[in-house]
Amino acid sequence: MQQAPVVLSTLDKLLNWGRSNSLWPLTYGLACCAIEMMATGGSRFDFDRFGTIFRASPRQSDVMIIAGTLTKKHAEFMRRLYDQMPEPKWVISMGSCANTGGMFNTYATVQGADRIVPVDIYLPGCAPRPETLQYALMVLQDKIRRSKAIKQDAPKRLV
């Protein structure tokens, strides 16, 4: 007697597989890196094969890509957008200016996006090539697959 095949997995693996293969970035382009980020949306790099679809609304996004110089006036707005994103959410800091302030070490610039929001992946360069952003998304997918999808200390809701 032959038995039907059974798929054994954990709920964590299933949720992480779905999350890692449907990344929807919120593009937050501020300077030169934004041009390279726009190039990744073209047919040459084809982010659709990774399940990545650029979104304009933070409520539909789970990844924020910060590309370029972050000024102190933009910092509050960027934090508000980050807070509007649903959980789980990830942040990619793209370029030297977003990572460390770059060459703009002035009173008006934030010296690194990680002072405003928690950053998961840093992309070095001025400006990083589209291939680098593509690689960063692949690294983020791997990071999501290895993470815990279900938090043990999550508060229980009473309905």
From Swiss-Prot:
Reaction catalysed by this enzyme: a quinone + NADH + 5 H(+)(in) = a quinol + NAD(+) + 4 H(+)(out)
Binding site for [4Fe-4S] cluster: C32, C33, C97, C126
Broad class of enzyme this protein falls into: translocase
Main localization of the protein described in the UniProt heading: membrane
Membrane topology reported for the UniProt record: Peripheral membrane protein
Subcellular location: Cell inner membrane
Cofactor(s) needed by this chain: [4Fe-4S] cluster
GO MF annotations in UniProt: 4 iron, 4 sulfur cluster binding; iron ion binding; NADH dehydrogenase (ubiquinone) activity; NADH:ubiquinone reductase (non-electrogenic) activity; quinone binding
Cofactor binding mode and count: Binds 1 [4Fe-4S] cluster.
GO cellular component, one term: respiratory chain complex I
Keyword Magnesium: no
Organism domain of life: Bacteria
Keywords for this protein: 4Fe-4S, Cell inner membrane, Cell membrane, Iron, Iron-sulfur, Membrane, Metal-binding, NAD, Quinone, Translocase, Transport, Ubiquinone
Annotated EC: 7.1.1.-
UniProt function note: NDH-1 shuttles electrons from NADH, via FMN and iron-sulfur (Fe-S) centers, to quinones in the respiratory chain. The immediate electron acceptor for the enzyme in this species is believed to be ubiquinone. Couples the redox reaction to proton translocation (for every two electrons transferred, four hydrogen ions are translocated across the cytoplasmic membrane), and thus conserves the redox energy in a proton gradient.
Protein family according to the UniProt entry: Belongs to the complex I 20 kDa subunit family.
Subunit text: NDH-1 is composed of 14 different subunits. Subunits NuoB, C, D, E, F, and G constitute the peripheral sector of the complex.
Annotated protein name in UniProt: NADH-quinone oxidoreductase subunit B
Organism annotation: Helicobacter pylori (strain G27)
Organism taxonomic ancestry: Bacteria, Pseudomonadati, Campylobacterota, Epsilonproteobacteria, Campylobacterales
